[in-house]
Each structure stands twice: as structure tokens, then as C-alpha cells.
Amino acid sequence: MPLRLTLTGLASQYIHMPLAPFCLKRAVDGSLPDVTTTICDLNINDTQEDLLHRVMATEPDVLGISLYIWNRECAARLIRRVKALKPEMIVIVGGPEATFSVEETFREMPVDYLLRGAGEESLPALLRLIMGGGDASAVPGACFRTADGLHISLPAPAPAPRSDLYDETWHSALNGRMAYVETSRGCPFQCAFCLSGHHHKVALDTLGDCKQSLSLVGQEPDLRHSNKEAPDARTVQFMPVDEALALLIRIGNSGCDTVKLIDRTFNCSKVRTMVLVRGLINAKQQGEIGDVCYHFEVAADLFDDETLDLLATAPAGLFQMEAGLQSFHAATLDACDRHTDMAKLVDRIRRILRPNNIHLHIDLIAGLPEEDFVTFGQSFDNAFSLHPHQLQLGFLKFIHGSKLRMEKWGARFAPDPPYEVLSTPWITYTELRRLHDAAEAVERIHNSGRFALAENLALEYTGMRPFSLYLLLGEKMAARQGRWSLDNLTRLVYDVFLCLGVPEHALRDAMITDRLATDNTGYLPPFLQHEDASAVKKAARAYREAHPGCGYPRVAVLSDGSAVVATWTKKHPVTQRGEVAAFCGK
């Protein structure tokens, strides 16, 4: 009999478009012509009433929801409402939050089936049984209630990603949003706080063609990060590299600004990395790719000289990278099964940053084992000294299935998603709260790029450690309730830096230049404006006379009477700062 299936991933924000529903739709459409599949584009910021209305509008017989730490609670409420309204509707859940918490999921949600592991094969098999009858225990990964309790299966294996997923349905749904793309599954490493490397098998034969093309036969994924006990057990499923390159080029022309690869370690194979990087650089240079940025998660210490030399030739802004340091503390890295040559990693990060053509993020995680407040501060200072474009401070999540959640090491964490650390034997709840405040300050002040000159000036004049400075800024921000406008934040930074002894004239000039470089309106808050408004008007008039047709220039007068202008004709593709130049304003 015909069946109507509705799939949703319940994204955390509208800009994020989960891949799982599209993977599953493709799998179902290809094998079950009697099933009509609809993807319901929902996110957790919608009201429960709206979520229910939009699901019911698709008139499903079966509802499938992917569970993650960001949507589990919202999904549970939605499922309870769906079942209250239409008890006969069959609800199937999957995803990591289902795979690794089977009993909890059945206890908390009135679901009919739970699929562990990859669903591309198991979902069509289960739907076939729902339509025609049969024993669901034969379906890989299928879990369900029985008269005796629960039938729990082992997770279904994951197939390699497929490029045909990204069809017209996917492109239409994209609609200018960030494009998430998967060209590999799994990870060759087994970090104790993560799931990606723990449940996959290797399929390296897909690299055959690119090995020959580069004369680099025999270079497999590098396992230097990983637990040395059993490296052969940790592997990756790759999309064929030529197929992956063609896909990335095609999506680069889809109209999106950013193509974000969700591959856990993009550069785990040097051969594959070289093929994809060189191919994208060539495509950009030949005009086959528009104004788009490709975002990769990398293990920076795996880059060798040849790969770094190639990356240095990339057009500015083509690539963005996220390097997960997590910590500089050796005991912490060891406790997390991360065996990293830190000196090499630091060198590689500096070499990536040197040409200023790649936007680089560095990640730190607070709450890891063996890491106290002092050693985290040292990690912060070490990471900050590398001058990444963004320094991201995260907090340990005790996700289901991770080694750190399963081990008994005295940590306390929130019982509800995202299961964030509350305290450990090494760091207190109060200290973690201070780090949360500092993280907010880092995100709004450092990572925004809006205060780069002022920040450098404050560190230079005060001699403060970056960690101490951002603890202070976080404390001041936390003491002030309410929303932060740009002007309010600028005032807070100005006041804090002034109290620390930064000379007023130098600080004002730095903040004026920062503002003009990052805000194309040219507006300055009153406390940064020159006291003589006529001097600013005179400077603007002088610039217009020297540059006919320039429109209304964004001009400011500095403390010494000199003038600067932001033309915004040149915005750096990596820093996104506009050009601010001095000129004679007399």
C-alpha cells in the first residue's frame, strides 16, 4: 500500500540545513516507489504549535526525526504532541542521540522504532516491513518495544557518502543558506570526547585513482593523533576523490557564500587533500568557482611542507580552516587519547597563517580531564599568541557513546542535552562560569574582528596576559545585563581599556580606525567623535574634491588633527576589514 513519509532534522538555526533527511530521502526514493517522501524544514526556534502544524500539514503515515544534542528536547516535545493528536502515526528516530541512548529514548519518547547507526539501508528496509509485514528484528540497527522489554540491535554500518544526494531537491532547499557537504564519514582518530572515530570501518580503495595521479601510492590516513594501541580499527569512508572534487566545484557555483565540509578530519589523507586543494585552487584561478569559501576541519600537525606550500598559493579567502587544539596541556591531551606533536602543530599553524590567505579558527575545550583553571589559562595564552583569526572557547559535552561519558572520573555534567560539564576534580563550577563569561567576551570582542587595533594596543600598554584581559572583560560584560548593541560594547571596551591605563588619545584613534574598518556606515558613537564637528566636515569636503564621484566618504579626524577615510572599495577577503587610509584633510 502507498505510504507517506515525512523526514526532518530539526536544525538549530534556519541557516543550518541538516543533511540526514536528504540522504534518507534519496535512499527511500531509490528503492521504494510506493513511498512518497517529504522533507519538513524545521528548526528548534519555531514554536511547538508551529512545528506540529507544519508536520501535520504533510499528512504523514510515518514521521522520521534525526536526534542530536541540540534538538533532542524539542524533538521529544514534538513527538509527544504528534502521538497525542494522531496515535496511529508511526514515529521513527535515528541519529547519534538515538544510537547511543536507546533505553533513555524509549523511556522519554513515545517512538515506535529507533534506528541505530546509518539509516540509508535500514530505513528503506524498515518501511518495506511496515508496508508488507515481517520481522523488524531482521533490519540492521532496528530497535523497538517487545512484550518482554526492548529489542536492541547493533548499529548499522555507514556507507560512503554519495554525490547524487546533492540534487535539485537539495539545491532548492538550500536557498542561499550555508551548504553542508559530506565527502567522508568517520575519523581515523579516537579522541575520548568525540564519537566520530569510534564506529567506522576503512574504505581506502576509493583513493586508488588519485594516488596514481599524484605518484604518491601508499600514503594512507595518518594516525599520529590516535591511540597507538589499535590504529587499524579507526578508519574513514571516503567519497571517490574525483567525484568529491566535481561536487565541491558544482556547489561552489550554487550561490551560497560558504561550503562547509562536515568531514571530521579533512586532511587525514595527504593524497586526497592534495587532489581536492589543488583542484579547487585551479578551478578558482580558471574562473570555474565564484565568490565562495570552503570550510574544513583539519588536524594542523598532519600538514607536511608540500601541502603547506600548496595552501600558500590559494587565492585569499578561498579556504577557511578550523584546527582543534583543545588544549596545550600534555596530561590533558594524553587523557583524551590525543597524541599530538605540539611543537610541530604550532609550527604548522604559523605557516598556515603566514601568507594571510586562509581564515583560521583555533578551538579550545574547557572541562577536559587533568585541566585546571591555571593550565587552561596557559592554553588560552598559547593559542592566542598564534594570532588566529578566531579563538573558539568550547565546553566539554558528555555526549552519549563518548569514552569520557562512559568513564568514571569524577566529573559532573548537566543531565539534559547538551550534557555540558559542570565541574571536574580539577576545575570548579565557579571557575567554569568565569570561563563562560570570558568566552562571551572573546566571541564578541576578539572574534568579531571589530576591535583588533584596540585589543593589540591594550595588551601592549598593559603587559597583561590575554587570558587575564578576557577574564576581566568577561566579568565586566556579565555585570551588565541586557542585549549588547555595537555602541554599548564599544563603550565598555573603551572604558575598560582606559581604566587599565591605555592612553586616551591612542585608544580613541585605534577604536576609530577599527570602527571605520568594520562598519561601512561610517557612523561613530558620540564618545569617539571629534570635538570639532567642523574639522570633520572640512576633511570630508577635502576628500570629495580630491576624489570626484566618491559619494559621501566615511571620514574621521584623529587626535593629532590628521584625517582617515574608509573607502570600502577593498575589503580583505580573510579578515573582512575594509581599507582605512590616511589623507590630507586640510
Describe each PLM feature range.
Residues 2-3, 10, 59-60, 238-241, ...:
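A structural motif corresponding to the C-terminal lobe/cap of the Radical SAM core domain
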